[in-house]
Each structure stands twice: as C-alpha cells, then as structure tokens.
Design a protein with these regions (language model features):
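Short amphipathic alpha-helix with an adjacent loop that forms part of the alpha/beta core around
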Residues: 136-146
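Conserved acidic E/D residue at the C-terminus of a beta-strand in Rossmann-like folds
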Residues: 111, 180, 204
C-alpha cells in the first residue's frame, strides 16, 4: 500500500514528526509523480507499506482513506469504552466509524441520507443511527448517555449546523474533532466551548498511521468489503466514476477502477 505523499527530502518522517504538515507537502497524482490510474509509478521506499495476503488488493485500495479515519481517531484521544458521535456518514465518516468500533468505542452516527444510513447499518459501524430530520440529535444523544453527552464528536460534513450539533452534544471536557476540509468560513458557539471546557481539534490526512491501520484490517477488526460500492472498467471512469461522484455521491462510498474487467 502506498502512502501517497510528496515530501521534501530534508523533512523528518519518523515517529513523533508531523511530516504531513510540512512545507510544500503534496500528494502523488495531484502534485506529480504519476497517479493511481497509471500502469506503474515509482515510489520511494519510505512510502510503501507491506500488506499480507489477508487483504485483497481491491480492499487494500481503501487503506489510504481508512488511514484518514485512523488519524482522526488518534487526534481525538478517544479510548476503549468512550462514546463517540460522528456527524456525517460519507466515505470518511463511515471509515472513521469503522476505526472507532475496532477500538472498542461506542458509535452514534447522525445522517440525513437514507442510502448512507443503510450503508452504515450494512457495514455494522454504528451502535445508533440518528436522522436529524426525524429527531432532536442532542436530546437523543443525552438519552443514550445518561444525560451526560458524548466523550468525543467528529464533524465530517463541512456543514455548520452539524458542527453546532457536535458542540452541543458533547459532555464537559469532551473533544470536538473537525475532520472535513472546509472551503468556506464557519462559526462555532464559543460560549459552549468555554463553559464546557471543550477541546476543538483539527485533523488532516495521516501521519505514521498506515501500519496500525493495516494491522486492524489484517486482524479482522475491520472488514473493508462493504465500503466498495462499485467496480468499473477504465473506459467507464468518466460516466460511472467521476460523474457518479459529482451527481449521485450518496450512493457511492468507494469506486474501484479495474482496467482488467
């Protein structure tokens, strides 16, 4: 599995480093060095992580986004027995929830889309799924946590109302982790953050997460098969790949492009 970074040679990449935040960081396929649809690419040894035959290659393609979820989990400081609220069951939200479940954390997902709610149920990554169009999420969370609120909340939508819900659903001294990449300014209820002494944290990509992520899959703690929603030929890349993701992304989690089909 390739950790698809382009990092300057003088940047430390060992344990404890933050190479993912380094100057001029970029990604293979976006910033050069070939791309994932190339027949072959050359990758520096540092960015290649071995996998066993316990992980089929099509599922191995999901290690990269799963590592995003793992890094968000690490940033949260969540531990076994905690209760987490995941705001949004898109691809990253679902994979994050899978990591949390594998780590022994009780997961509550809030999601509007029926297709995404169904996928969360199918994948078994949530203990509870709440639809904000049907229930008051904060009130339901309080009922599920003996009136206390969750230990950690993950915002995965870039929607301000969801961020507001994450803040209000937290117990005092909880963590709010912002997972999504916002293209627009957001507001946050600073009064709630202060009065409950909440920690608000960002998370981006991954940093020394791949090895532990691979281990979770190889040990059978995460099954990636449910997250592959479609396999397409290379000549279907536009119509069944990009256009589906642009116009009908609620039905897609991860689409595998296989030139050999």
């Amino acid at each position: 599995v390739v950790e698809p970074y382009i990092i300057r040679d003088d940047v430390p990449t060992g344990e404890g480093s933050n190479y993912h935040l380094s100057k001029d960081m970029n990604f293979i396929g976006l910033g050069g060095c070939g791309g994932g649809l190339s027949e072959k690419i050359a990758v520096k040894r540092r960015w290649v992580h071995p996998i066993s035959d316990k992980i089929p290659l099509d599922q191995a393609a999901l290690i990269e986004p799963l590592s995003v979820g793992h890094h968000a989990y690490v940033r949260s400081g969540a531990k076994e027995g905690d209760v987490a609220l995941v705001g949004g069951a898109g691809p990253i939200g679902l994979l994050l929830a899978a990591v949390l479940k594998a780590k022994g954390i009780k997961v509550i997902i809030t999601e509007l889309s029926k297709a995404r709610k169904d996928k969360a149920r199918e994948a078994g990554v949530a203990d509870y799924i709440l639809d904000p169009s049907e229930v008051d999420v904060v009130e339901e969370v309080k009922k599920l946590t003996n009136g206390e609120g969750v230990d950690v909340a993950f915002e995965c939508t870039s929607v301000n109302k969801v961020l507001d819900t994450m803040v209000e659903a937290c117990r005092p001294t909880a963590k709010v982790v912002i997972v999504s990449i916002w293209s627009h300014p957001a507001t946050i209820n600073v009064h709630s953050v202060v009065m409950k002494e909440l920690d608000v944290r960002g998370t981006i990509a991954y940093c020394n997460d791949h090895a532990e992520t691979i281990k979770l899959v190889e040990e059978g703690k995460i099954n990636l098969e449910p997250f592959i929603t479609q396999r397409i030929k290379l000549d279907e890349l536009i119509s069944e790949g990009f256009e589906r993701l642009i116009h009908n992304n609620e039905s897609a989690v991860k689409i595998i492009v296989n030139p050999n089909l």
